[in-house]
UniProtKB/Swiss-Prot annotation:
Catalytic reaction annotation: (S)-4-amino-5-oxopentanoate = 5-aminolevulinate
Source superkingdom: Bacteria
Pathway: Porphyrin-containing compound metabolism; protoporphyrin-IX biosynthesis; 5-aminolevulinate from L-glutamyl-tRNA(Glu): step 2/2
Major location category of this protein: cytoplasm
Protein name stated in the entry: Glutamate-1-semialdehyde 2,1-aminomutase
Residue numbers carrying N6-(pyridoxal phosphate)lysine: 267
Amino acid sequence: MNQTRSKALFKEAAVLIPGGVNSPVRAGKAVGTTPLFIDRAQGAEIVDADGNVYIDYIGSWGPMILGHRHSAVMAAIETVLKRGLSFGASTDLEARLARMVADAVPSIEMVRMVNSGTEATMSAIRLARGITGRDGLVKFDGCYHGHADMLLVDAGSGVATQAIPGSPGVPADVVRHTISLPYNNTAALKDCLDRKGEQIACVIVEPVAGNMGMVEPDPGFLSALRKETEKHGCLLIFDEVMSGFRVAYGGAQARYRITPDITCLGKVIGGGMPVGAYGGSRQIMKHIAPEGNIYQAGTLSGNPVAMAAGIATLSELKKPGVYEALEARTRRLADGLARAAADAGVPVQAHAVGAMLGLFFADRPVTDFASAKTSDLSRFAAYYRAMLEKGIFLAPSQFEAIFVSTAHTDDHIDRTVNAAKAVFADL
């Protein structure tokens, strides 16, 4: 495909923006490409600056579960825009979205809106530390919880893509409180908490690990987290920024029936607008200022445009049959890709949960970050470039999930699988 305009725009952007992008994974370094510059999108399709049309499986990295420019979401935004963008004061939209979130997510009775997933996780950890009076934090290798200093330890997502073990500028004194354990390893968790439980404020986890390429929790892993954190007086935080309202209407905690103490949300609840949230029981959330003394604030938190988009999105997702259709289509894609690879003799591991999909170029099961990193990254890069040439827009990283939306049709899925058949044959 001709990408002359995108390349020219990237060259211009690189003079003004570090790396030419405002989030590192977009740069495409891991797959040997320069980034596409997007002109517009509609439904499940996205159009670049050169006019090339692609079937989109990035979905703005997860938020666009209804597809691009969904009529109900656009109408809600347009209505709010006529009244103003942001007021620095409360609107009824904040409580309306909060009610929808609380009704859907088992762990949430009260919720605080913020502007990003990173804000949500860093605020949730501060809350846990403030409540427990402890500093220790346990996370899991390959789980990415945003770019807050204490969380950039053995992280996934763009950190894994860039092969950066952490980041310069993160003080050693900050990360000394962070312990990172293997995902899906209950023995390691139990041993850690048995030794250091009285120092640990919280355990944070992606219940479905989308930021290492989409790895599902082993049976019993999440229940072990719940049991061990309760035993040692630690708070359990589910980072459902990615999985919330995507693997089920109530998130992974509803799907797996494990209730954490605090839940972090983002992406889908903003309908494509910048948003984040964290919530829990009234007993926990009463500690947040101004009701309590644990401080967190944000100028644009709860802004009306994001709230309106979120309300419209969740209203659509509540309709009967939505998640059944999403899951069926995601499974159709996963099964089709797996069959196409097998027919070509290309070893892959395909995982599907709800409307998320992971495809690893690996010859053995992927259950944690160590096994995810055995993937053939050069083969993935070749696959990515060839699929892009065939009009399939995937995340430019082996360690990112594939997102399916309600706008994807069986025809989109079949065209994607047919493209993959041709690509696998040449890998």
